[in-house]
Amino acid sequence: MPEPITQHGIKIAGENPMIILYRPGSDDIVVLVSMWTARYSPVGSGRALLIWADPDESGLGSDAPIGMYADNPELAEYVWEHFYRDYDRIRGRGIETGPPVPARFVEVSGGDRFHRISCVAATTTIELEWRDVLDYFQVTTRLTGFETSAVAGPCAAAEVRVNGVAARGEIHQPEGWFGSSAALAFAEIWREI
């Protein structure tokens, strides 16, 4: 007899790669990026970039982005309210203080060599690049009332460029369950438990 099918309420499905750059030789974060691509969410599909960069330490000065960029503003607000409520590493940096900035996104993949997402807003272009995928594996976590599963791809290198200028900073390896502070996350699903 076949096993019964169990259905669970899905809160979001898509991708969520991240980049965290540190001041060289330290644990001080200088750039923090969380890039969401929702194929499904209760507020529709789209992309939302949550980003914080220290103006001085990143070397980006007055161009250092802090905030949310989105092609679906409701998605950016939904992601912030539902998935970052207990994530101290990103909270308190001012990301949520302004409304989401309207933006367009372009994605290019070079297999295991690189993955690039460009975010273009009125006066700002933010380019995110993950390079040299080290491995792919499935990870399942239970954080903040959700079960999350994803296909993770920790990377050996990453770069964040704003208006053509590369942010200073280095990734950490190993770090967390992804093994790198620059990691791709495909087929990511969050369900409430």
Feature roles, as predicted:
Residues 1-193:
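Targeting-peptide/extracellular-domain and disordered-appendage signature
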